Amino acid sequence: MASPLPVRAAALSRDTNETSIQIALSIDGGELPQDADPRLLEASSAHASQTSKSQVISINTGIGFLDHMLHALAKHAGWSMALNCKGDLHIDDHHTAEDCCIAVGTTFAKALGALTGVARFGYAYAPLDEALSRAVVDLSNRPYTVVDLGLKREKLGELSCEMIPHCLQSFAQAARITLHVDCLRGDNDHHRAESAFKALAVAVRWYD
């Protein structure tokens, strides 16, 4: 009988002067890790959530559009992920958006664990209507990011458009990966941003 595959999951609590974050992530979907903070699955606080046989996703950052992007990332990467953040949104969105993506990247790296048997390089294209994005990833342990989304609006919902590339940079830095993300075409900034997160999601779907 074949040995069961190792569980690729991790949970993290991250507290700073600006944010308090709890996150749990299972790269292969399914149930969240047993040491996940129970507060993560409080349905009343989840702004972007779904539950199925293969995935559990519950995201509450306090920023609706960021919830939407992280939900898209988890869904299309095949992850189960729960994240809750209380941040200093009375100041602006910077600390919350940055710290949430640092937490996602850190937890992803922890859950992925040893890279033996995992493809080092991943890439994907993802469309959303008229928008098309490309993501290329290298599990290099040398964090580096190039992001070109061509966003023109000041904000999408309550998330500053300048923070969207920074979110991708923060994820890559914490995950210790090299990441290139480009939106190749598109008229709608919502579509451009979402297709970028979906391309990243598909690019990081590594399996043993």
Swiss-Prot record:
SUPFAM superfamilies: Ribosomal protein S5 domain 2-like
E.C. numbers: 4.2.1.19
Catalytic activity: D-erythro-1-(imidazol-4-yl)glycerol 3-phosphate = 3-(imidazol-4-yl)-2-oxopropyl phosphate + H2O
Lyase listed as a keyword: yes
Key words, A-Z: Amino-acid biosynthesis, Histidine biosynthesis, Lyase
GO MF terms, alphabetically ordered: imidazoleglycerol-phosphate dehydratase activity
Pathways involved: Amino-acid biosynthesis; L-histidine biosynthesis; L-histidine from 5-phospho-alpha-D-ribose 1-diphosphate: step 6/9
GO BP term, pick one: L-histidine biosynthetic process
UniProt signal peptide: none
Family: Belongs to the imidazoleglycerol-phosphate dehydratase family.
Name recorded for this polypeptide: Imidazoleglycerol-phosphate dehydratase
Lineage summary: Eukaryota, Fungi, Dikarya, Ascomycota, Pezizomycotina
